[in-house]
Amino acid sequence: MFQFDTSKLEWTHFEGGPHFDYHIDYAIAVLGAQPDIGVLDLLVKWAPNAYCHYHRHLAATTTLVLEGEQNLYEVGDGGEAIHKVRKAGDYAHSPGGDLHMEQAGPDGALIFFGFQSPDGRLFETLDKAH
């Protein structure tokens, strides 16, 4: 069982508004950053069944699901929808560039993200038209 005390972290909370047709409710805590070499480590926690904003990672990204479940909704090269489910303990690494949204499972989610970007660009938020 994961035993890291997240209550001592400084969390920044994000919510959607009436102009979103999906429930946005997540928080980010910076664990560490080394801007001179383009490294950022984050914890992100989601409320049950909540989403983050639609976005694209520009940096190489390491993902480790610590608690709960991550539903990843990607857009394939041909515009097709791809749904992946990652459970606690699942690890992934991607080079960046994929359009996607993430949604927590019914018990929420706590996920570690490590970004590596030589130019300092990590991700960009997008609208439905990209």
Regions found by a protein language model. Give the residues of each.
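A short, N-terminal "cap"/entry segment at the start of jelly-roll beta-barrel domains
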Residues: 1-38, 83-84, 126-130
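Conserved hydrophobic/aromatic beta-strand scaffold that supports enzyme active sites
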Residues: 28-30, 41-45, 62, 83, ...
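Active-site region of the double-stranded beta-helix
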Residues: 30-37, 48-60
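Short acidic-glycine-tyrosine-enriched beta hairpin
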Residues: 35, 76-97, 104-105
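Short histidine-centered beta-strand/loop micro-motifs
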Residues: 42-44, 52-57, 74, 83-84, ...
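Histidine-centered metal-chelating micro-motifs
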Residues: 50-53, 71, 90-102, 119
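Glycine- and acidic-residue-biased ligand/ion/polar-headgroup-sensing regions
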Residues: 57-77
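Double-stranded beta-helix
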Residues: 80, 101-130
